[in-house]
Amino acid sequence: MGALTIVAKYMIVAQIEVNGSVDKSDIIGALFSQTEGLLGKDMDLRELQMMGRIGRIEVEISEKNSKTKARIYIPSNLDRYETALVAALIESVERVGPYLASVKVLEIKDLREEKRRKIIERAKELVKLIEEEILPDTKEIIERLKEDVAKAEIIEYGPEKLPAGPDVDKSDSIIVVEGRADVVNLVKHGYRNVIAIEGISKGVPQTIIDLSKKKSVTVFIDGDKGGEIVLRELIKVAHIDYIARAPPGKEVEQLTAKEIAKALRNKITLEEWLAQQKAAGEKTESQMSPQQPQLTQTQPTTAEVQAPFDLSKKIEEMLGTLEAEIYDANWTLLKRLPVRELPDFLANSNDSIYAVVMDGIVTQRIVDLATKRGVKVIITARVGPLTKVPEDMKIVTFDQITQKT
């Protein structure tokens, strides 16, 4: 079917069967000639076509066994009554050339209805486009508002101008994350005591190191290898208390409120993290720091640690408990507590402490707190990465003592 010459309201679709071989021009000629004058001049096909009331007649033809079958299309700009008359008119054709023929109208299409249907379908698509891309839902608006408010609350902290929440100074504890986007996400969800290190390419910022000496520190890392690298750099120079981790493959900046709360709720102590690394077969100390603790010179052997009881039996008793015992200068037991509570105890106790025996890992933070309390002896299951140990402090491992007995 070719192009139409008018903007039609209706389309008459008819089928003609001819008992002989004819072409398109024969069929169109028969339509004009055999209907001429039947309904008067006003309904003559030629006159209607000249006035633009009907369009160009199109014929799709096929021939088989010396018979011709064709589909006829007549576009009409008449009203529905006049269009119906034209349709009935062409059914009156009985011959094409010398051959008998029959015409049957198959349908009269309302082209305006087809246009209306397409318009409605397109309108539906556009409404969906508006709903999905132009008009955000209430939840999205609230999330945008939260993020805008969070960004407005972000401050620049310290000489390095690190991105931080507004409560870093006021809070006794802080959450250390990697980047500004992490800070924005945590502040958005109500965690205002957060600060970012902004990468470790230039080392850990001094501001973070200084804060870690005064506050309880939770490092919140991404759930990938990059997060572990950041953590190891922090452990070298800062006093880390707890470690929280995003789910595997996720970054802190991507987490929902529930995911953040769960990760922080499941945080572990540095000692527990180091123990997990060992259990996983990782050589944690060699990966984390080139400054491994040296148990010579500054760490005397067990012969230099004197106690009024059998230290080997004490170690056997302590193994597997994850607890610590606190002693005064007379080796009188002052307190027994979980290793994870040891840093807080050392920071807040007014007791005169001489020795600590612990089934855990000595970290730099524990050494620093013990130094402030005047501790002279630490007997421990393991020694973590240390950067400084007082000359008058003895740090001895369980293995050193048991190997000497």
From Swiss-Prot:
Keywords, alphabetical: DNA replication, DNA-directed RNA polymerase, Exosome, Magnesium, Metal-binding, Nucleotidyltransferase, Primosome, Transcription, Transferase
Bound cofactor: record note: Binds two Mg(2+) per subunit.
Cofactor requirement: Mg(2+)
Gene3D superfamilies hit by this protein: 3.40.1360.10
EC number annotated for this UniProt entry: 2.7.7.101
Annotated Mg(2+) 1 binding sites: E178, D222
Pfam families: Toprim_4 (PF13662)
Keyword Lipid biosynthesis part of the UniProt annotation: no
Region (Disordered): 279-302
Keyword Transferase: yes
Residue ranges with Low complexity bias: 290-302
Binding positions for Mg(2+) 2 per the UniProt entry: D222, D224
GO cellular component, one term: DNA-directed RNA polymerase complex
An example molecular function term from Gene Ontology annotations: metal ion binding
Domain called Toprim: residue spans: 172-248
Function comment: RNA polymerase that catalyzes the synthesis of short RNA molecules used as primers for DNA polymerase during DNA replication. Also part of the exosome, which is a complex involved in RNA degradation. Acts as a poly(A)-binding protein that enhances the interaction between heteromeric, adenine-rich transcripts and the exosome.
Assembly notes: Forms a ternary complex with MCM helicase and DNA. Component of the archaeal exosome complex.
Family assignment from sequence similarity: Belongs to the archaeal DnaG primase family.
NCBIfam families: PRK04031.1-1
Stated name of the protein: DNA primase DnaG
